[in-house]
């Protein structure tokens, strides 16, 4: 089990050292723009890092939508992201589940997901689908939909990323999320380990620092005890607060 944080891309190694992580997650292009990542100038440095590196794909990507003007650019941006991530040996690229929109065919959304993963297979990069917090037309908010998606894509080079804030906000009890994710995939590939500023089933994606939000501490501790996988904190407050959250996780793993 490796523990780290989502940190800045430009000084990733230095920031990871500061929060005392042995893994980290970065964006390699703007999360809110349709701009493909540029080749990294620090490939050698990243390749020499002694731990897994995760890349979070831009938030704009929605490979499930029936809207061609969004789906096609999403596939291109995902593939370009995978190519650059592969260049420095990233372990996986994390992508939000997306949505089919009002009146969309969710079954078609699952098929679009399969096509998107197939398109990036030649990059060798593993895709991790992340559960999301809100939206009744979302692919990966409700557990039943996540399970149906897995039936369509589970034989490909793909895994699941469990975000604890998102499952809480999406109305999936934490222990149930862990058990059902593991039943699907045998091993959860990655946990985005975040507390929540909001109440259960709020559909609001507002992360909070560990132990300071609304998710009961015993629920968070259950995740650490039962997931046995890499942990990335995506909590607010900058590096100083993330350093505290990384330490929070380490204390509970060693006790």
Go through the PLM ranges and name each one.
Residues 1-80, 255:
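N-terminal pre-domain/capping segments
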Residues 3-7, 24-26, 53-57, 93-95, ...:
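Hydrophobic faces of well-ordered beta-strands that scaffold small-molecule active sites
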Residues 14-20, 39-54, 80-89, 118-124, ...:
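Acidic (Asp/Glu)-rich catalytic clusters
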């Amino acid at each position: 089990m490796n523990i780290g944080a989502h940190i800045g891309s430009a000084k990733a190694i230095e920031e990871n050292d500061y929060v005392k992580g042995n893994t980290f997650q970065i964006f390699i292009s703007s999360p809110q723009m349709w701009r493909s990542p540029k080749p990294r100038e620090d490939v050698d440095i990243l390749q020499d890092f002694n731990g897994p590196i995760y890349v979070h794909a831009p938030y704009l990507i929605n490979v499930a939508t029936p809207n061609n003007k969004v789906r096609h650019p999403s596939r291109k941006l995902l593939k370009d992201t995978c190519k650059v991530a592969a260049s420095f040996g990233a372990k996986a690229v994390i992508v939000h589940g997306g949505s089919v929109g009002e009146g969309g065919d969710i079954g078609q959304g699952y098929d679009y997901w399969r096509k998107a993963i197939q398109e990036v297979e030649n990059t060798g990069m593993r895709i991790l689908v992340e559960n999301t917090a809100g939206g009744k037309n979302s692919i990966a908010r409700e557990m039943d939909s996540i399970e149906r998606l897995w039936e369509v894509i589970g034989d490909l080079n793909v895994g699941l990323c469990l975000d604890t804030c998102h499952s809480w906000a999406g109305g999936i009890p934490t222990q149930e999320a862990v058990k059902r994710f593991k039943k699907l995939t045998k091993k959860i590939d990655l946990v985005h380990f975040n507390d929540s500023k909001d109440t259960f089933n709020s559909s609001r994606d507002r992360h909070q620092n560990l132990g300071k939000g609304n998710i009961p501490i015993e629920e968070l501790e259950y995740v650490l005890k039962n997931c046995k996988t890499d942990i990335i904190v995506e909590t607010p407050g900058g590096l100083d607060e993330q350093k505290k959250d990384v330490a929070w996780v380490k204390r509970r793993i060693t006790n």
